């Protein structure tokens, strides 16, 4: 749409008659299939499952354009993966470089902190190895929906990682 792209031009009828028009809409469910195939970070997928409205945002403000796109989420995912390998933490300012909508960037950065907390608290490596404590199940039983969904997505993400490693062998 022209409001998102200044290089968009109106074509005359002769030109329009010779080209094919493809309307593209932001669709999280379609992107999610792609995301699983390319290994988007589980924290990104988990967050977007909870906050689908933040998948694609475009706003004009007095301070300029604020936006979040699928490309931004994918690039942020790659950065998170690199930071994890280096043992570095992703903070709000870094997130905002990829998600150029301050409210969404702040919300995701807060979610990422919770995600890491759940990762440590629930001992997902041990759960996947078949070992878990009774209190872990009790804690999950009484956890909020968001927390349970995050833990499920953590497990799914770790399993996807293990399957990928197995395929590469």
Regions found by a protein language model. Give the residues of each.
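Sensor-1/coupling segment of RecA-like P-loop NTPase cores
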Residues: 1-6
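A short helix-turn-beta junction within AAA+ P-loop NTPase domains corresponding to the substrate/partner-engaging
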Residues: 8-29
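Alpha-helical lid/collar subdomain of P-loop NTPases
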Residues: 37-168
């Amino acid at each position: 749409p022209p409001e998102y792209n200044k290089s968009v031009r109106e074509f005359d009828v002769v030109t329009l008659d010779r080209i094919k028009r493809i309307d593209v809409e932001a669709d999280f469910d379609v992107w999610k299939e792609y995301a699983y195939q390319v290994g988007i970070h589980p924290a990104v997928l988990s967050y977007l499952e909870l906050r689908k409205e933040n998948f694609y945002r475009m706003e004009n403000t007095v301070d300029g354009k604020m936006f979040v796109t699928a490309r931004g989420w994918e690039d942020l995912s790659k950065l998170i993966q690199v930071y994890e390998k280096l043992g570095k933490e992703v903070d709000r300012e870094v997130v905002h470089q990829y998600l150029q909508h301050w409210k969404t960037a702040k919300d995701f950065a807060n979610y990422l902190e919770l995600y890491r907390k759940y990762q440590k608290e629930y001992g997902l490596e041990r759960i996947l190895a078949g070992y878990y404590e009774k209190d872990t199940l009790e804690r999950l039983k009484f956890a909020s929906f968001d927390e349970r969904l995050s833990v499920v997505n953590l497990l799914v993400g770790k399993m996807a990682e293990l399957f990928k490693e197995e395929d590469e062998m």
